[in-house]
Structures are given as C-alpha cells and as structure tokens.
Amino acid sequence: MKKLTTLLLASTLLIAACGNDDSKKDDSKTSKKDDGVKAELKQATKAYDKYTDEQLNEFLKGTEKFVKAIENNDMAQAKALYPKVRMYYERSEPVAEAFGDLDPKIDARLADMKEEKKEKEWSGYHKIEKALYEDKKIDDVTKKDAQQLLKDAKELHAKADTLDITPKLMLQGSVDLLNEVATSKITGEEEIYSHTDLYDFKANVEGAQKIYDLFKPILEKKDKKLSDDIQMNFDKVNQLLDKYKDNNGGYESFEKVSKKDRKAFADAVNALGEPLSKMAVITE
C-alpha cells in the first residue's frame, strides 16, 4: 500500500511538473506576443513621428511663401496659398495637443478667443484670413501678424523632434478631431471668412487615416472585421469630399455645399468615428 501511495504521489508530481512546464510555455508565448505588439506599436508611432515632421516641415515652407506674399501686398497669391498651406497643419491636428500653446497661437478662431476673453491676444492664420477675405486689405497690422505667424511656425518646426507622441494620443486625437469635424467644423465655423472648410476637412480626414493605416496591420490581427469597417467608412467620407473637388485640384467654397450634403457628410464622419474609437483594442 505504501509503495502504491509512493507511486501515485510520484505520478502526481510528474503531471504537475508537466502542467507547470506547459503553463510556462503559454506564458512565454503570451509574453513574446505582447513584446511583438509593443514593437509594432513603437514602429507605427515612430513612423507617425516622421509623418508629422514632414507635414510641419512643409507647413513652415508654405508659411514662408504665404508671409512673403503678404509682405509683397500680393492678395491673390496669399489667397491662393492660404487653404493649401493650412492643409499641412490640419493633417497634423490629431496630435495638436502636443503643440502646447503654439496651437492656439497659430490656429485659434476669433470666437474661441472671445469666449475666453482673450481677443486682444488673437493671432495666427485665422486673423490674417479675416484681413484677406473680410476686410479685403493688407496693411501694417496684417504684415506684423504675418511675421508673428512665421515666428510661431518656425518654433513649432523646431519643436517637432521633441513632441511627446504616443499611441494613445494618436488614437484619441484622431477620434476627437473627427468628432469636432462632424459636430462643429461642419457648420463652417473654422473658415468663417474664406469658406475653405473642405480643404481642412480633407486634411483632417487624411491625418486620421494616416494613423489608421499605420496601426492597420496590428488591428487586422486583433479584429479584421473592425478594420474593414473603418476602411469602408473612410472610403465613404472621401467619396463625399470628392464630389466637391474643383478643376484645379482644390475644393469648392463651402458655401456651395448643400444642407443635404452637409448632413450627409456629418453623418458619414460620425459613422466613421464610432468604429475608429474602438481601435484602442490594439493597445490591450
């Protein structure tokens, strides 16, 4: 009996040991898988860092040309550059939180400044937009504002390499931006003087889509259906924007967009935002 008990105990210990080995193997596989995902997230974030650097570099170059047009009193050239140069900034807007106080200096609207009782501090592209499109003049104040804009654009460009960009900021920033497009920008409040809102919308969508494209390989391993749903909704939004392309590679005035199409666009962006908000699954 004692011998049998000893044999049973030995067998139990052997099974337990094998079980522990299997458990260790499973833990090892999970750990390697987690390390793999972390490496992919790091690589995607690094690629987005590079993308943001490129956009801000082009933004600075474009701003230099824009300011030169202001200095030369070239209203037509300044207006031609305005929406196109801003697209570089708008593509970077998912991570504008990382820009600190340079974001409001460059991109604040008068309505926002009034709400905060800071209208005397108003500066940036939208202040110059008002001068060009509503006041229809370039004066010494406009030129001074242009120089300040260039100074801020240079500072942002210099800061680009030190921006604290994380997967969480990228994901949350893209969702928040599209929500802003669908709920407030769609009213035309962003480009209230120039009505070049469609350029902004396109750039915002491109910025969010860049984030999706970079994380797509990771997402497809976790949830292929969700990834396909996001892609389908991006396609729908872009199709609606394409409807208002002009013959010069730009976009029609937002004033030409019908109420029906504004609603359709807002609905499409909302429909995109819903699955996009679930992309955080890649960090789990």
From Swiss-Prot:
How does the entry describe its membrane topology?
Answer: Lipid-anchor
Q: Provide the lipid-modification sites (N-palmitoyl cysteine).
A: 18
Sorted keywords for this record are: Cell membrane, Lipoprotein, Membrane, Palmitate, Signal
Record localization:
Cell membrane
- One cellular component (GO) term of this entry: plasma membrane
Signal peptide interval: 1-17
| Residues lipid-modified (S-diacylglycerol cysteine) | 18
InterPro entries on file? EfeM/EfeO_iron_uptake, Imelysin-like, Imelysin-like_EfeO/Algp7, Imelysin_sf, Iron_uptake_EfeM/EfeO
Family listed: Belongs to the EfeM/EfeO family.
Official protein name in the record: Efem/EfeO family lipoprotein
Query: Which organism is the protein's source?
Result: Staphylococcus aureus (strain NCTC 8325 / PS 47)
